Curated annotation (Swiss-Prot):
Part of the gamma-tubulin complex. Interacts directly with mzt1. Interacts with mto1. Interacts with mto2. This is Spindle pole body component alp6. One of its GO terms (biological process) is spindle assembly. The keyword Glycoprotein does not apply. The lineage of its organism: Eukaryota, Fungi, Dikarya, Ascomycota, Taphrinomycotina. It is found in: Cytoplasm, Cytoskeleton, Microtubule organizing center, Spindle pole body. Its main location: cytoplasm.
Amino acid sequence: MSEIHVKTALSRLADKYLQNSKNPSVPYTIETIVSFFQEIIHSISPDTFQLDIDDILYKIYSKIPPEENNDALFSKLSNLVSRLKSQTVIHNKSQILYFLYLLSPISQSSRDVSSHLLDESISNPINIPSTEVESSNFGQTRYDQVPENPQITDWDEGLENESSISIAHDSSRLNRSTETSSVQHTLITEADLLSSISYVLQGISTEYVQFKNELALLSKRIPVQYLLQMRALSETGLLYQELKVFSNYDPSVSQSIDGDNVSKAFINDQSLALQSLKSVISKELTNFLALIASLDSQIRADASLEKPMVTIRRCIAWTQVAKLKLRILSSVVNDNMNQENKKRLIQVVSKYNVHGDPLIQELSDKILTEITGPLYEMIENWIYKGELVDPYQEFFVKEKNGSESHDHQGQGDVVWKGKYFLDKELIPSFLSEELVDKIFLIGKSLNFARYGCGDFDWAQEHYQKLVKKLSYRDPHSLETVVDKAYTESINHLVYLMEEVFHLTDHLKAIKKYLLLGQGDFVDLLMESLGNSLDQPANTLFRHNLTASLESAIRSSNASYEPEYVLKRLDARLLELSHGETGWDVFTLEYKVDSPINVIITPYCSRQYLKIFNFLWRLKRIEFALAHSWRRVNLGERNVFRNLDYTKFEWHFVSCHLAEMIHFVCQLQYYILFEVIEISWQELQLAMEKPNATLDTYIEAHEKYVTSITHKGLLGGGKSRNEDSFLHQLHDILKVILNFHDAIELLYNFSCSLSNRIRINVPISTDALAAQYTPIKNELSNFTEEFQVRLQKLLHGLASHKDPEMRFLSVRLNYNEFYVSHRRRHDKDVTSQ
């Protein structure tokens, strides 16, 4: 702008002032005021005009008294400054704004253009605000948020945003003197500050900036136009020092480092990922030092030039990218200080990878590539060898401590089901849940094949065939290797279970011999053991039971079973109790060992024992009823045909015996065909699926056993609960056995009476009635008790939520016999 234009603008400003003057009687002319304005302009230091508009605006804001309601003033001021910025014909906008600031009442160094001050101002040019105090006085600048809340929260606000790691500057804390000092001080120039920038960027104390712990103390001698710039550089130095202390921290050293708040948090929380992070930080700090060295050499070379090209503002611009990187690294470090994030460093860094800023994405990718190196090595050991190498417990696959003690319900061998588990909190976000499940299953399969099945050769072949270096930068290779390893390991494990360890053959053998599916074997065993099991339990010997078992095997189709099946079948006695018979303690067991016991677990074996005991008791009842039926039919034809005295009772017995046989046969049919066979078909379908795994086998077998115990009336409740179906069935079967014993008494009485009649022995009517009446009463009582208990069972089955249970109720009472019988009984009771 030419001198004429400047003078014209000042004249208009003076005229504007005179029009708005609060004291119009003062005889000042436009020329006098313009001369005053020119004196102000000439008295301003050239360095002052290097301030930009934002710095000057910040200074104006800081001078406005806070107790006033300044919202409207701030809004108006911002609007005017925006209009000033939009003027394209004005080039020296910042100088104009600073000049107007000096004229304003809020400027402590300005003079009011009024009354008696004007002459003094003209004769004594305006003083520039003092920028010097005693050299020992420093304004205190603090990183308040670094140790307390070090998260980078405002990345989207731009690179100049200072809110995340802020230097809290308080003008009252700086305590800059605005009064004219009687002692002349040396003015700090930009060249002086530039000479110390390389030290400030490293967090090293200088004459103008001192660093103490996490504090940066700025000298009050620093000119105001450089204050914000030096604060920005001091922030970079604090970031550098924080990261340097963290990267150099050695947990093996017991002594503490002053100000090392970050590193102290990691004394007992070292990990391979954390060590990799320290390596990344060390590399970035080395690059930053190279940048500082280049910057320092440029400053030194520029010092000899007449017109230096390097300024503090340019230094800030050149180090801005490096500063942002240091911010990100500091945020990562401080985020990981959270106790919940100690082992989740990869997850902490991963959230920066979805940021929209390319620089942040690039740095986070670089960090992730380094810190995921140990993770991918653990994955390689796991999917190639089935070995868990995790010295710092940071891998998402964990090994249970004391896993054997966790097998309270016998849920499987610890090699497969109780040894390893997934810690979902440690799963990185860039690995899908499906991929992690496959990785987990591959390692378990390899470990199980090696240590559970003893197949070391295949595990070595698997490693040599698939070995490939994995990394974060090549996720496709990881998916390809995992899919291939998953298919091979699962197929091989299924092959081992089926072909080498004969899993299906063992399940079929259990179905035949423990679930009484081999009819000829069961009948022969029942006949050979019948007389022995009638004896008291304490008179039985195991070798006698074993001999009967071997005899039944040789005499039935069981003799064609493979040797590895027959040698697992054994007879034994349960724990003896006083007064029990052999029927109460005899049982068959099928012994399984590793690795079959992973599927046929100890818990499942106990369930099989429970099922066998119930089916064996039901078979005993069937055997007893068949014997009673032969007694009735053969005796009626040969012995009791002409015996009128017991004819009515034998007819009564025949009717109710058929009723009990119907109940037992229908119950057996339901359990053997509707429950066991249907569940067996479902088990086979699950095991024959092309993608079936060992876990599929385990789940299918558990479902198979659970279905039998539940639908077979064995899992409706605790056995001691009077309302459970199992307890009711035991009571009904006990009544049937008592009825069978009463039939034996009636048969013996009838035979004795028939012989006495045949040989014409005198018979006393009273003596005969004394023997016969108790038998009649027992038969009647047992029959009535059977019907009452059966009706209660039918009522429970009919109201059960399971449709198959309701179907059993229909089978047992298909013609509503017990409903009509109950109506007749209630009618007879009412009539009496």
